Structures are given as C-alpha cells and as structure tokens.
Amino acid sequence: MRHLLSAADLGRDEAVALLDTAETMADTQSRAIKKLPPLRGLTVVNLFFEDSTRTRISFEAAAKRLSADVINFSAKGSSVSKGESLKDTAQTLQAMGADAVVVRHWASGAPHRLAHAGWIAAPVINAGDGTHQHPTQALLDAFTLRRRLAGPDGPIGTDLAGRHVVVVGDVLHSRVARSNVDLLSTLGARVTLVAPPTLLPVGVESWPCEVGYDLDAAIDAGPDAVMMLRVQRERMSSGFFPSEREYARAYGLDAARVSRLGKHALVMHPGPMNRGLEISADAADSARSTVVEQVTNGVSVRMAVLYTLLAGGPDGDSTTSPGSGPEGGTTP
C-alpha cells in the first residue's frame, strides 16, 4: 500500500491486516509509557485546508506515539490564504523533506491529485476530502464494531461477515457514509442507509448497500449497530427537510428508539454531534454508545496506517516491530 486515499481501495485481506495491526497498537497504548520507536527520524505533515479538531489531533497523537516529528499546517494564516496553489504547497513540503502527508481538503479528489500528480514523493493519507472519502474514519468504525462484536476468540483475523449496520441521516453530504459503505461491505457486513430522499445522493442505488426511508423499520430489523450521521448544516442552503424538529422526530435517535434495539446493538456517531437533532443526549450518553471509544480507537487505527505506510507494516521490509525498542519495551 503506497497511499491511503479511499476506503474503496482496500481489499478484504488488506483491511483486516490494518485492523489487526491497530489491535497491536491499542495493546501498547495501555502502558504507562505509550511512545514507540518505529518512525523516529521521520516527519509527518498534517496539511489541513478544512477545520478539524478530532482528526487532526488524532493523527498528531498517532504520529508522535510512533516517535515521528509532526508539522501541523493550517490553510488559515498560511500562503494558501494568499493564493498559493495545492501544487506549490506540495512542492514546498517536498523540498522540506516530508516523509508522509496527511491531507484534509474541501475539494473532493484533492488527496488523489496530490498523490498522483508527481508533486511530492511521500505517501499521502486522505483525512477527508469534500463529500467524497474519509478512509481512516471508516477503519476506526470497523475496528470498533469488530472489537465490540467479537466472539470468544477475539477480533484478530476476523471480518464483519453476517453483521448488519444501519447508517442514518445526512448521506448526501457525508464522506463518512460513503467510506463506511465501501469498507463495511468489503468486510462482509450488510449495510442499510436510512435518510429522507432529499439527503440521498444521485446514484446511491449503485452503492453496495440497501436504502430505506423509515428509521423505525430499520431498527425493527434488528441491526448490530446504528450509526448516526451529523446533519451538516454548513453545507446546506435550505429545503432539505421541513424543520429541525421534524427531522429529529423522523430520523433522530432518541431513548425510545434505543430501547427497541437488540441487546448487544451499538450506537455510533463519527462526531461532532448535534445533540437534540440527529441524536438525543440520552442516546449519545447511553451504555450502548461507542462515541468516546471511537475517538480512542482512532489513534490506534491511525498509528497502524502510518506504521504500515512508513515502516513497512507487519509483513513489510521494516525490521522494527510496533512494540520494540526502549520506549515501548517488547511486543506483548
């Protein structure tokens, strides 16, 4: 794997290998000293053209826990705000010796352009591009599902075959929905999208999933997890739904709907949440909720991605294992 640009680029075995590596990383993060040596001497650049809190901090934590140096670049206040192009920015990073670039961009396809235009030699990781893809979010969601739903033998080596995940809400503007449909279906899960017709994209019938319009019917189908999507009001003008109150009534997950879920069903949300709109406070804070766990797992998953791309991964040419060295001790 040279870059991570789209969840659709991952095959089943490749995805499972990343998730297994993330399990190893997660095990090391329970230690008093969490820092590991594999990326010592390498520089990871977080190149963010859109505002972000969780994703940027998560990538920064992941890189630093692998001993990489991190440069955080924000478009605001930089030469980009003065009109510098993506090409010029990339060539500047190349000249400075960036070993990996994590990019978030408002334009769909920008990370792919950066990776394949020949402007930079470093691996590129897509941290979200427009309404297109967010592959590490899909990986951390799959990691959370696999870990929480694992059988007695644990999650290592397993996929999500036979599981049913319902994804609810603003699919039209959601790169998380697209990435999860791609990855979860690759891992064998059945995925159902539930949204008002106005918040479904053109061509959704060609996606590897089912589509419905009734949240209550989807809950009654007994899914293993319900993933709520943030209503992205900043990407909307008007007319997508009659009112926020009506949206919450028809498509919001509240305590009553949570109570009808199966005994082991999970409540997920990629964050940030609009409490009281797509999810109630009771649902978000319930024992079924994995919202905080997803944030924790995001660091382990992003460590696995950086390790795989920059250190050769568990089956690559690197002679350094994730848990070796003075900072980390030995791999458990």
UniProtKB/Swiss-Prot annotation:
Catalytic reactions of this protein? carbamoyl phosphate + L-aspartate = N-carbamoyl-L-aspartate + phosphate + H(+)
Which InterPro entries would you find in this protein's record? Asp/Orn_carbamoyltranf_P-bd, Asp/Orn_carbamoylTrfase, Asp/Orn_carbamoylTrfase_sf, Asp_carbamoyltransf, Asp_carbamoyltransf_Asp/Orn-bd
Is Ribosomal protein a UniProt keyword of this protein?
A: no
Keywords for the protein's UniProt record, in alphabetical order: Pyrimidine biosynthesis, Transferase
> GO molecular function: any one?
aspartate carbamoyltransferase activity
Top-rank EC class of the record's enzyme = transferase
Q: Which GO terms describe its cellular component?
A: cytosol
Claim: Cell division is one of the keywords in the record: no
Please describe the quaternary structure of this protein.
Answer: Heterododecamer (2C3:3R2) of six catalytic PyrB chains organized as two trimers (C3), and six regulatory PyrI chains organized as three dimers (R2).
- What's the family? Belongs to the aspartate/ornithine carbamoyltransferase superfamily. ATCase family.
- Per its record, how is this protein called by name? Aspartate carbamoyltransferase catalytic subunit
Protein species of origin: Beutenbergia cavernae (strain ATCC BAA-8 / DSM 12333 / CCUG 43141 / JCM 11478 / NBRC 16432 / NCIMB 13614 / HKI 0122)
